[in-house]
A protein has these predicted regions:
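Extended catalytic cores of very large enzyme megasubunits
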Residues: 1-291
Length: 291
């Protein structure tokens, strides 16, 4: 524990410098050691070389409302950096995704997947754009390090190419099933959950997700109903919540609570986004007014 704390303090010295006095550094260090205060757990984990390479790994929580195909890779990248990712598959977002063209039989040259976070994300974006355009592409995974290989910077062990292969095959299947149409909210949710399932290192779950959906989205309401973990196990990586901004009727709320009870999973939750303005911290409100 003391080594972890010292690594964190050392990294913060690199960035904060003399903005804190030696007495303040010592006070912060002691507070963390005694667990009286706690900094970002992600930064506690990745302070040092990992955070120097990309400071995204320092953040506990992130959020993406997918409205373009690149957003799926953004969610993947954030998850691979160890961040928790919230996403909204509300119809107002998913309906902005383009219409899927019917397959033309045209095939692109084989794409070699690079052995990096960016390489995996680029492969996903290429696949989605290709399938949306009515074309197809084959991927070469020969550059991806094998399962069990040591991850020197982030720690842990590599999962090998199989999770990415499964993700790309699954995404292709869901996209091609909607040729001539658009992805449904449940389709987008499932692809993102499959991304979460893909982001695994050495058998350790590194994905934390929350999915927001429309209150009247019945498919999302029933996404974790019954033995979903047998038919759609990837859905386990995300907690699901319905979101509303205008007060629902008693009947609407009762429908949601009954569905939650019958699901057996305790989901979906319900999130009152309309009340956020009343609970927004003044310091944050003042900050956003400045920028």
């Amino acid at each position: 524990w003391v080594e972890t704390v010292d690594r964190y303090i050392s990294f913060m010295r690199e960035n904060v410098g003399d903005k804190l006095t030696e007495k303040e550094y010592a006070e912060v260090r002691l507070g963390i050691l005694k667990q009286e205060v706690m900094p970002s757990m992600r930064l506690m984990q990745f302070s040092g070389e990992a955070a120097r390479r990309c400071n995204v790994c320092a953040y506990n929580c992130t959020f993406v409302a997918p409205v373009k195909l690149e957003d799926f890779a953004e969610i993947m990248y954030l998850s691979m950096q160890g961040c928790g990712v919230g996403f909204a598959v509300e119809s107002q977002n998913i309906e902005q995704l383009p219409q899927i063209m019917k397959q033309t039989g045209q095939k692109l040259p084989t794409h070699t997947v690079l052995d990096s976070k960016e390489g995996w994300c680029d492969a996903l974006t290429l696949g989605l754009k290709t399938w949306y355009a009515g074309k197809d592409v084959t991927f070469d995974f020969s550059e991806v390090r094998p399962a069990g290989a040591r991850l020197k910077t982030m720690g842990g062990k590599a999962s090998g190419p199989e999770p990415l292969k499964n993700l790309l095959a699954y995404a292709r299947e869901r996209v091609l099933a909607r040729q001539g149409r658009r992805l449904r909210t449940i389709d987008a949710h499932d692809v993102i959950c499959k991304i979460g399932e893909c982001v695994v290192a050495g058998g350790v779950r590194r994905t934390a997700m929350i999915s927001l959906s429309d209150l009247d989205d019945v498919e999302m309401r029933d996404a974790k109903k019954g033995q979903f973990y047998m038919t759609d196990p990837h859905r386990s990586v995300a907690n699901n919540s319905a979101v509303y901004e205008v007060q629902p009727t008693n009947a609407e709320l009762m429908d949601e609570w009954v569905a939650l009870m019958k699901s057996g999973s305790g989901e979906r939750g319900i999130f009152n986004r309309g009340s956020l303005a009343k609970t927004f911290p003044k310091r944050r409100e003042d900050y956003y007014k400045k920028i």
